[in-house]
Structures are given as C-alpha cells and as structure tokens.
Amino acid sequence: AIDFETANGKRTSVCSVGVVIVKDGKIVNKIYRLIRPAPNYYTQWTTAIHGLTYDDTMEAEDFPDVWAEIKPLIDGLPLVAHNSPFDEGCLRAVHELYDMTYPNYKFYCTCRTSRKVFGKDLPNHQLHTVAERCGYNLENHHHALADAEACAQIALLIIPDPPKPKKAKKADKDTHVGDLFASLIPQQVKKNK
C-alpha cells in the first residue's frame, strides 16, 4: 500500500510517502520518507491536514533519490491506495517532472472497492471510516505511513486475494478496479445497485 502527502495543490509537491509492503497476506516492510517537494512551498490548508511544514522537509531528499530506495522493494507488486487516482496521479506527476520513466504500476483502490463491498452501509468511504468498519484503529490520520498501513489492513480484508498484475491488453484499458473484484462483493450489496 502507498500513500503520498503533498505540500500544496500541485500533484508534484509530494512531501512524504508511506509504503507498506505485504507478501503472502503479511506486512513484511514499512517505509516512511520525507521528500523535498517541487514546488517547494506549503499552503496553510495542507499543513493543517498533515502537519508538515517547509522546515520539516528543508533538508529532505528530492523525489528521485527517495524513489531509488523504494522502487526495488515494490518491483512487480501491485500498488494499493485509498483514493488511488490521487496517489497514482502524484506518482505519475513526479515521474514526469523529473523526466523519469514511469513503469505503469498497477493500482488498486480500497476506496472504490469499499463502495462496492459496503455500499450504503457506511456513511462515507473515507479512509478512517472504512478502517474503523474493518476493525482497524487509524491513529495519526494523514501521516503517510499511518494511512498506508490502514490501507494495507483494509485491502487484506476486502481484497483478500488480488489478481496478479498482468500486462493490459487493449480491451482491458476500460476495466475498473471494482470490476476486477466483482466476485468478492456480497450478493446483498450487488442487489442494491
């Protein structure tokens, strides 16, 4: 599971990353790194969300150096995020900013899957709400590692055996995460559509 926090409204402004590596249903590694954001400024509203400031990341490494450490640890693994379009968008944006080749990581979304699995049984599908529903106590919400760990715990419960990543065929480009896990959705939720 992966989670990014950003310094401002730009997707390239990743200022921290949390990665939780799961193999055979067990958490085997946790990584948390601060990143010098690009552009390197913080807004009041982002700092209010995650608590990070310019001083926290002033001496942090740039994204390429941080990613050089993380990339070999996740090669070949699917990535799971809560609201994956945001995290995947950040990852693509910083790869483009630094002229790095993007390896077309396969992303799965616990938020989208939660909507399929829990439907209207939850008041919303925010990370802390879904984590609580799955019996996980999310402390320190909006800390990248805490959020990645909550996402991993959710995925272990609602995506117990995600499909192995495969190269997308032309017909697969319109496949959505929810479609991949349709067999996991309880019948009563399917009927509510």
Label each residue range with its predicted role:
Residues 147:
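Conserved catalytic/binding loops enriched for acidic/polar residues
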Residues 103-114:
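Conserved beta-strand -> loop -> alpha-helix junction used to position metal-binding or nucleic-acid-contacting
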Residues 4-8, 112, 150:
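Short, glycine/acidic-enriched loop or turn micro-motifs at the edges of active sites
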Residues 91, 113, 151-155:
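Buried hydrophobic packing segments
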Residues 133, 152-193:
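Acidic two-metal-ion nuclease catalytic site recognized across multiple nuclease folds
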Residues 1-104, 120-142:
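Conserved non-catalytic scaffold segment of RNase H-like nuclease domains
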